[in-house]
Amino acid sequence: MENEEQFADRAHYLQVVKLRPLFPVPLMTLPPVSPIVNPSVLSNITKPVLEMKLEDGSIFRMGGIPQNIALEIWQVLETRKINKNLPLDSPDPRLTLSQAIIELAEVKRARITDIIPQYNVYVAELDLIPEGFGKPITLQMVPSHAILVALRASAKIYVSRSIVEDAREEEIEERKEDEGYFDV
């Protein structure tokens, strides 16, 4: 596998330099049941968000993160903040999937590579070398799960430049249209 910094298509990716999970506040301006709000949309807006600061200084946010994954990411980050060399032990002897992956493979990097527009979900790829296999493989994963594995393995995380640019354009367009504001 290529050098950590020099993987194929590195120029098409921005490295994540800082990361923080944001948890929703239980108070909101929408009623819990509203005829204008689709229940699946309501479910998504009450889920955590991962906010990533990228190497170019921009911010990339990814919503709809499962609560348990966001909490596990937060625990890994908090443990590292206290002591970078502290093992990420848990009182529970059972392994989570993210822990099992790093036990069975050398994780090189996680990359958020694409979006599936009809579902409005991102796709990630996890580059790793399974123990005893020697040959690199790439797994497509749910991005939040790939990020968790990368954090546990101290591997780098990247986001596709095209995804970041599309998100910026969408944000600019929403500002122009005063998205979310009501006329008074």
Q: What is each PLM-predicted segment?
A:
Residues 2-184:
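Divalent-cation
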